[in-house]
A protein has these predicted regions:
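N-terminal accessory segment detector
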Residues: 1-107, 118, 123-136, 141-144
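Well-ordered mid-protein domain cores that form the structural environment of catalytic cofactors
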Residues: 110-115
């Protein structure tokens, strides 16, 4: 889900506008729509590649935009801890005083990746997040 660096702040603004105009429920509905419409192929790759693929995917997209993370994977789960999230790094870099991420920005991760996990046959658990660019989450295979 790596994005163009200059757009990260735009996402924060869009999410704030969307919630203000249409309400919190509509914002979550939008994120669910994005997951269903944009990420079925990624969900299939998660399903087929398993936890090792999930860990490799996040490693690639976070390092690509100069973030830092640790990952662990076993046969049933992948845990991703983002130590420096590119979203935060680049929003700080390009900030004009209006685009810094808030908790709703990171809730988009929980919602969208939660839906991707569901499509792939995994549970998704947001273990921690803050508005300083640190997140930790886990994908765990559902019992058959």
């Amino acid at each position: 889900m790596a994005a163009i660096r200059e757009w990260y702040g735009g996402y924060s603004i869009i999410y704030r506008w969307f919630e203000k105009k249409f309400g919190e429920d509509a914002l979550y509905e939008y994120w669910h729509f994005v997951a269903r419409e944009v990420y079925p192929d990624l969900a299939k790759k998660f399903q087929e590649g398993g936890p090792a693929y999930i860990a490799a995917y996040f490693t690639e997209i976070i390092l690509e935009d100069e973030g830092k993370l640790t990952v662990t994977a076993d046969k049933d789960s992948a845990t991703i801890e983002i130590l420096e999230c590119p979203d935060h790094i680049w929003q700080v870099y390009y900030d004009q005083g209006y685009s810094m991420p808030n908790d709703k920005y990171y809730k988009s991760y929980e919602t969208i990746y939660g839906d991707i996990a569901e499509m792939a046959g995994y549970d998704f658990e947001m273990l921690k997040f803050d508005t300083q660019g640190r997140l930790k989450f886990r994908f765990t295979k559902k019992e058959a």
